[in-house]
Amino acid sequence: HESPYRGETFVTRKITKAVGRISTGIQSHVTLGNLDASRDWGFAGDYVEGMWKMMQYKNPDDWVLATGETHTVKEFAKKAFDHVGLNYEDYVKVSEKYFRPNEVEYLLGDYSKAKKEIGWEPKTSFDDLVSMMVDHDIDEAKREKVLIENNLLEPTWEFPT
């Protein structure tokens, strides 16, 4: 469940936050872990709608809310950097420090039961989700840049030297 309000320690938001800052000149690079991990990333707003539909259903049950698509961390980073016209390979570094010891390589959800029984399916595409998050973080980075230029914010990230 991703959105522009996802915590900055989660990989999707770490990437989009870095893209926003890099594109405005206040960050030099981003360091990530396993670029080959695959996830089923969907928009939190779509999942909230799914939860509401679950609550309206006549009988309690369990349903999976997912997109039915999987994308790697590398794909997410590439799409995010492409959105601002940059090559992710120029800005992404990989460190073993960020590899999880018990990494699940591949996660994919099947929402067919939710579609059949409660009429739910995801509305936001992967491309739209990434673009939404990057656009939000570009706006935030522009505000951060003004604060940095006026000595009101000390960067705690990979700041260009």
Where are these regions (language model features)?
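Conserved catalytic-site region of short-chain dehydrogenase/reductase
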Residues: 1-5
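C-terminal substrate-binding subdomain of Rossmann-fold SDR/epimerase-dehydratase oxidoreductases
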Residues: 6-7, 11-161
